[in-house]
């Protein structure tokens, strides 16, 4: 029998096309070969997963806390599954519009009091400059009276058990450096000082087991664009694929120096550590679990870490395989000119994603405004997430051509890389511009089309002018890097306003591909849920 809240949810004008929305996601079994691991390693994995579950509970409270009792009360079925996929009642593929009820998504989610607006916050901070640091801190909540509460205080109920599980996991680790990192990260959960453990994390050397476990990304914050949400992923090293990436590491400092950006905005050897790991992930939580399924990450985001030791590039091999097999290649075959569609490949897409993640760690660390260094996220505001994703895409493609020109990548595969990039765009823009990656790639598509690098033929298929791609990428990389370097919010907003609308012909072409999923829904062999 339904709980009263579940009945209430079903009576709240649930979207009538719910099952069609759910069908946009291809259920994919994510396998886990338990027999590969020793009993101690299994205990380690179990403790890490238990810790991830605690962060899951926090994420829902940051995102849409009113949906927790509804989710928990619903029986298994389409509505419960779709709530889980999105982590809230807001459909990430439909510009974050509600599929339960009609209340619009609060731009600050539950990170700010709902009555607050960006203008009101900025005006208050201008009148109370001593409070700016606390208001703009990436790990504080802001109430209607502009009082701030640190995450480690607000969420202690879940952070304390999460820290305990991390310490337990450390006791089962045979890797002393990883065990020490886990203990340091456990402490960071309880005081919000992630800097020491982030340093230790980047310095880990080829760990067999690893974990993403922190409030890193700002995707939930559409108000100021600075508040982070908790995310987690248990990682197991894919040794064979990791070895293939080692060759890229030595080129990162030279790519940084080659960017179309003034020298004063290029940290000289930023990202020089650049560890790259190809991992399989059996369990994810929080912002890594819901909506857009990340196939790679570049972390941490702290520019102080980037300056000192670089950042870590992580590629989720089992998730990337699912996306390529079920979404990108099928979509490319339908949308692209036949001869170019066959050039798109899984390996080409992996290379494009690799360059994207490397490029998150390249470019300016801070914006320069009025002779001072300013945090880029703070300077750009809500447009930052889309801007940064676009910068990583475009700078990555610029860097890819640089590597080809120097013989680090085979020249004969350049067209394969470009075709794979464009096939990936068709997948990403289906998320709409309410999602950072979708907004970024919609802008990229329109800019490249304006430059004649992407065209549409009389049959409705899209074609890539390979000769025009390098110049177009160089021009766009220069624009995006300059926006970040100057922290010019108005320029960023005007740029997206000009380029982030989906053309009607592309909309119609994508509408005709509804039998191809927008993304996959990972089905993991471990218990998921929110407490």
Question: Where in this protein do the model-derived segments appear?
Answer:
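Sec-dependent signal peptide recognition
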Residues: 1-7
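Fold-level signature of zinc-dependent metallopeptidase catalytic domains
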Residues: 17-30, 35-47, 51, 128, ...
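N-terminal mature-domain "stem" immediately C-terminal to a signal peptide or N-terminal signal-anchor/transmembrane
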Residues: 14-95
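N-terminal accessory alpha/beta regions
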Residues: 60-132, 136, 140-141, 145
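Long, well-structured alpha-helical subdomains associated
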Residues: 397-494, 498
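Secondary-structure edge/capping motif, primarily at the C-terminal ends of alpha-helices
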Residues: 62, 169-173, 487
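Extended, compositionally biased alpha-helical segments that mediate assembly or anchoring
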Residues: 477-531
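Boundary at the C-terminal end of the N-terminal hydrophobic targeting segment
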Residues: 7-13
């Amino acid at each position: 029998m339904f709980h009263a809240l579940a009945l209430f949810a079903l009576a709240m004008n649930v979207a009538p096309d719910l099952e069609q929305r759910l069908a946009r996601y291809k259920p994919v079994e994510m396998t886990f070969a338990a027999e590969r691991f020793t009993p101690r390693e299994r205990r380690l994995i179990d403790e890490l997963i238990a810790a991830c579950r605690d962060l899951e509970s926090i994420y829902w409270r940051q995102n849409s806390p009113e949906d927790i009792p509804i989710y928990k009360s619903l029986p298994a079925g389409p509505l419960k599954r779709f709530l889980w996929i999105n982590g809230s009642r807001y459909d990430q593929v439909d510009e974050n519009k509600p599929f339960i009820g009609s209340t619009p998504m609060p731009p600050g989610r539950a990170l700010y009091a709902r009555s607050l607006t960006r203008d009101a916050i900025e005006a208050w901070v201008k009148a109370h400059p001593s409070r700016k640091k606390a208001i703009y801190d990436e790990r504080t909540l802001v109430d209607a009276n502009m009082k701030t509460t640190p995450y480690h205080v607000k969420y202690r109920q879940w952070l304390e058990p999460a820290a305990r599980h991390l310490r337990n996991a450390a006791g089962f680790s045979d890797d002393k450096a990883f065990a020490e990192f886990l203990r340091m990260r456990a402490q960071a959960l309880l005081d919000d000082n992630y800097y020491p453990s982030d340093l230790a994390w980047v310095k880990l050397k080829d760990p067999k087991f690893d974990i993403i476990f922190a409030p890193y990304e700002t995707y939930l914050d559409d108000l100021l664009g600075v508040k982070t949400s908790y995310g987690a992923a248990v990682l197991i090293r894919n040794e064979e694929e990791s070895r293939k990436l080692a060759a890229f590491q030595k080129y990162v400092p030279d790519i940084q120096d080659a960017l179309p950006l003034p020298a004063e905005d290029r940290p000289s050897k930023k990202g020089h550590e650049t560890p790259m790991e190809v991992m399989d992930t059996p369990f994810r939580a929080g912002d890594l679990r819901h909506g857009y399924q990340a196939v790679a990450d570049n972390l941490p985001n702290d520019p102080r870490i980037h300056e000192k030791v670089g950042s870590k590039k992580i590629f989720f091999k089992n998730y990337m395989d699912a996306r390529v097999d079920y979404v990108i290649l099928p979509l490319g075959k339908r949308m692209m000119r036949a001869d170019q569609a066959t050039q798109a490949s899984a390996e080409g897409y992996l290379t494009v994603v690799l360059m994207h993640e490397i490029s998150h760690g390249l470019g300016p660390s801070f914006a320069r405004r009025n002779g001072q260094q300013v945090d880029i996220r703070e300077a750009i505001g809500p447009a930052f997430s889309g801007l940064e994703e676009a910068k990583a895409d475009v700078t990555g493609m610029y860097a890819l051509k640089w590597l080809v020109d120097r013989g680090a990548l085979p020249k004969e595969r350049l067209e394969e890389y470009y075709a794979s990039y464009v096939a990936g765009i068709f997948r990403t823009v289906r998320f709409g511009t309410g999602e950072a990656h979708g907004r970024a790639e919609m802008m990229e598509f329109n800019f490249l089309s304006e430059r004649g690098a992407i065209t549409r033929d009389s049959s409705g298929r899209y074609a890539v002018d390979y000769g025009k791609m390098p110049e177009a990428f160089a021009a766009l990389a220069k624009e995006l890097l300059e926006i970040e370097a100057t922290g010019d919010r108005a320029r960023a907003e005007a740029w997206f306003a000009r380029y982030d609308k989906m053309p009607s012909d592309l909309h119609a072409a994508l509408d005709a591909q509804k039998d191809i999923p927008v993304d996959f829904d990972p089905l993991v062999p471990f218990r998921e849920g929110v407490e």
